[in-house]
Amino acid sequence: MEEWFHKLFKTRKPIIAMAHIPALPGSPRCRLSLEETVKWVKRDVENLSKARVDAVLFCNEDDRPYALQASPEQVAAMTRVVVEAKPISGVFGVDVLWDPYASMAVAHATGAHFVRGVFTGVYESDMGLWSPDASSVARLRRRVGAEGVRMFFNIVPEFASPLGGRSPAERALSAQVSSLADVLLVSGHMAGAEADLETLREVKKASNVPVLVNTGVNEGNLERYLEVADGAIVGTSLKQGGYTWGPVDPERAKRFMEKARSLRRHLDQSRSTLPGPPTL
């Protein structure tokens, strides 16, 4: 496991909670003023912090229909929201759907620790033919002096299917070798959908970097996911009524993190009782 990963999250099997941002100015679903949006997201982050999540990931989840290139007004609004709502002290990341360049720019401007995105591959998607370029994003990171911003590669993205015949394990290995992925993510078919456990196992087996489950995690399946993955990103199951685009439910978030901490203690105890090498 990467040393930086443990230094950043300061725990095994970190839980990264989503701060889903309501539709931003310019988006068809935008209903709130920017001030109201900031207030909404700050409340969510406060509730997540009270639940003691390990990190927060800001994402413009309700900027539907999704686009592959963020608009200037989206980037400006997202930057303001993150600056005003980010945790006072704590780890946080940025994901501007589905524009990795915008994600890196906003992350650098706001002091984020990581970005999540689709950086490699070619996909048939709801947004059309999708062919991201990890090399350009990595070079942008270098140009602006953001080398400390880690790149979390979603190699099984939502709302899309990969073209070609490579397996998830093959895509995972090549993303590490040719595109220098810091972390790999495995998702379900859409936001809130469970990731395929066998795919997660294949990717984990092929990986030398941390692997996180990216969607569909809830109290009921958390244990089996954490037995395989190095952590989880969770959003929908922490929301009021389990509705992806709703506000965070403080009680759901609290229960989820209590379950996560209990599972981590159990995993640590199991690890400590494993037999060591035979003595000579």
Q: Where would I find each of the regions flagged by the language model?
A:
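Alpha-helix-loop-beta-strand connector modules within alpha/beta enzyme cores
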Residues: 11, 67-94, 132-153, 195-218, ...
